């Protein structure tokens, strides 16, 4: 594993039925704000086979501390209230995990 201090944030999201479009439009607005804070969206995935309404994100974040500071930036953004309301309406459940590459994995 390289000496890169970056870690990855694996986000598992379960959407409310029929709210994918609201969620996707809101994420499209919020993602650039996170990227300005040093995050990089490695990929956003929805299963072709598997749990309906699931969405998975993998973000590269500069450090574990960078997660909280970037979320503070999002909370302070002028559109934060609107984003919060859209996510409250569209997300049924969300789980976040900070992960590091394994010794046998190529780092994206």
Where are the regions that the model predicts?
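Short amphipathic alpha-helical segments
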Residues: 19-44, 75
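Residue-level signal for secondary-structure boundary sites
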Residues: 19-21, 65-67, 104-106
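Vicinal oxygen chelate
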Residues: 63-65, 79-84
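Short, well-ordered beta-strand segments in beta-rich or mixed alpha/beta enzyme
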Residues: 7-14, 43-75, 108
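Functionally engaged cysteine thiol sites
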Residues: 34, 59, 93
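Glycine-rich beta-strand-turn "strand-cap" elements at beta-sheet edges
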Residues: 1-4, 40-56, 81-108
């Amino acid at each position: 594993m390289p000496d890169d201090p970056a870690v990855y944030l694996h986000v598992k999201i379960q959407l409310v039925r029929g709210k994918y479009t609201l969620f996707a439009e809101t994420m499209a607005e919020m993602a650039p704000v996170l990227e300005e804070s040093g995050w990089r969206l490695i990929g956003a995935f929805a299963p072709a086979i598997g749990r309906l309404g699931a969405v998975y994100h993998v973000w590269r974040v500069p450090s574990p501390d960078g997660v909280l500071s970037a979320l503070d930036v999002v909370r302070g953004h002028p559109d934060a209230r609107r984003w919060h309301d859209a996510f409250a309406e569209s997300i049924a459940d969300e789980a976040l995990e900070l992960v590091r590459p394994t010794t046998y994995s190529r780092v994206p």
